[in-house]
Each structure stands twice: as structure tokens, then as C-alpha cells.
Amino acid sequence: IYTLSLHDALPISGPLATSLIRSSVGIGALLSEGIGDTVRISISGPPEEEIAPAKEILRCLGLRKGFELISCPTCARTKIDLLPMIDKVTKAMEGHDIPLRVAVMGCAVNGPGEARDADVGIAGGVKEGLLFRRGEIIAKLPQEELVDALLDEIERMANVTLNR
């Protein structure tokens, strides 16, 4: 009896967004049915850019554990400059497959509630924000301290050193 591996890939590329959508739909459909052992995302660009999206597809399907960042889509209640905060947290977590769900939310009104399933997170407010762990507020901090406090808490929870 032979054991064969089935490689899931779409041998088409395109701009980043197009490639990610095509690959997510195509490969995700196969993997969700239990079809496939390895995956490849095809992007017109450096092959290194294919790794993170492939891991994310596997995480979304529950086939791989690791760091998951959730953030709000922003609305009129967003009181902080959210995108740089998301970028800083994402960069600090690069290369770490820590099984934590981390939230970076734009407002303290909805943030902690919408991210109640997160292990740890921050939610912005006017010049200050909240640090929360598993839905419970653990600190109210000045806005400029939020990301570092979040990264400190991640390091404490995971017992690792992040890329700062």
C-alpha cells in the first residue's frame, strides 16, 4: 500500500488581492472537505509573501494553531490611529506561532465586547484606552502606552520575547 500526498494549489497568479481571494476560495474549499496535505498560494511577487497567507488559510479552517490578530473595521467611534498599532503588533509577532488571539480595537465602547473571545487586547479611547484579558479590563492607559502594554502582556502570557 502506498501513501500519497495531495498538494493543493492554484497555478495562477495575479495582483496580491486577486491571488489571495482566488487561493482562499479554491484551496479553502478543498481543505474544508479534507482534501489535500500541502498548500501553495501563488502570488505575482516574491515567494516569501506566499507563506503568511497559506498559514492564515490553515488557521481559519482550524487546521493550524498560532497567533491570530483580530481588529475592528473602524467606524466613526474609532478614536485612535488604529492601522499603525495593528502594524506594530503584527511585526512584533512575526515568526511566532504563539496560540493566542490578540485584539486591536478602535473604541472602548464596542471593542472589549466584540473581542471578548480574544485572549488579550486593547481598545482605544480619546487619548487613552483599555487593556483587556479574556474580556476583563485590566488597565486603563494613555494611548501612547497601549501597544507596548499589549506586547508586554503577550510576552507574559506566552513566556516569549517578541520582535520589538
Model-found features: residue ranges?
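Single conserved hydrophobic/aromatic residue that forms the stacking wall/gate
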Residues: 1-8
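Active-site beta-loop-alpha junctions enriched in small/polar residues
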Residues: 9-15, 42-46, 75
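Conserved alpha/beta-domain cores
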Residues: 17-32
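Conserved, mostly hydrophobic/aromatic
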Residues: 30, 72, 107, 115, ...
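Glycine-rich phosphate-binding active-site loops on the catalytic face of alpha/beta enzymes
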Residues: 33-47, 124-137
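C-terminal helical cap(s) of enzyme catalytic domains, especially alpha/beta-barrels
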Residues: 45-63, 133-148
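Small-residue-enriched alpha-helical segments and adjacent helix-cap loops
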Residues: 64-106
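Terminal leader/tail segments of proteins
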Residues: 116-117, 123-127, 134, 141-164
